[in-house]
Regions:
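Short acidic alpha-helical/loop segments enriched in Asp/Glu that coordinate divalent cations
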Residues: 42, 131-147
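Residues that define the transmembrane beta-barrel architecture of outer-membrane proteins
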Residues: 110-114
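Outer-membrane beta-barrel architecture
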Residues: 117-119
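Outer-membrane beta-barrel proteins
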Residues: 2-8, 136-142, 152-153
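Phosphate-sensing "switch" segment of ASCE/P-loop ATPases
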Residues: 123, 149
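Outer-membrane beta-barrel pore domains and translocons
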Residues: 1, 121, 132-134
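Conserved small-residue
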Residues: 1-106, 148, 158-168
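Repeated loop/turn-to-beta-strand initiation elements of outer-membrane beta-barrel proteins
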Residues: 124-129
Length: 169
């Protein structure tokens, strides 16, 4: 069965994409569209990349609205698209009317759920089985295996996370 739900009526409709609003599809995930990666430190520090691939601005880091504390984008980091063409990548006011460059990138609601149950009896011997699953589900995982060093000081770094971008690879 395919399972989708959309909000058609909500009393206090603020329009915030992080809350409930009329037209919201249950389970939607909002995020930024990736464009590529920064391959040099100079590229991370210079120029704004628009959705059409053109660059504007000199010595301007176009993703600065995404910085947290002292983090700065560098070689190997993800580059996001400026979808609304304002020269920066941000989430606007975080509302359905002004969501900046955020778009719907997925949905956490399980879809195409299925199950099969069968049984067999023969000479006092019973055999039953149940097979069930989900045909489609998207997730936004925030575990330390996905985003290391974001879950506190005691977070472990796994061996595969040491294989990061370098200009040589």
């Amino acid at each position: 069965a395919d399972s989708k739900a959309k909000i058609t009526d909500w009393g206090t409709n603020t329009g915030a994409i992080t809350g409930y609003y009329v037209g919201k599809e249950w389970g939607e995930i909002w995020g930024f569209k990736t464009a590529d990666a920064y391959f040099t430190a100079d590229e991370a520090a210079n120029g704004v990349v628009l959705a059409d691939g053109s660059r504007v601005g000199i010595n301007e880091v176009y993703q600065k609205a995404l910085y947290k504390s002292s983090f700065r984008y560098g070689e190997g980091d993800v580059k996001y698209e400026d979808l609304n063409g304002d020269g920066k990548v941000d989430s606007g006011k975080g509302t359905i009317d002004d969501h900046g460059d955020l778009i719907r990138i997925g949905n956490t609601t399980p879809r195409y759920e299925y199950s099969l149950r069968a049984g067999l009896q023969w000479k006092g011997l019973d055999f039953d089985f149940l097979f069930q699953g989900v045909g489609k589900r998207e997730m936004w995982s925030q575990s330390s295996r996905i985003l290391p060093l974001t879950q506190g000081r005691s977070t472990n770094i796994f061996t595969n996370q040491f294989d990061y971008y370098t200009p040589e690879n």
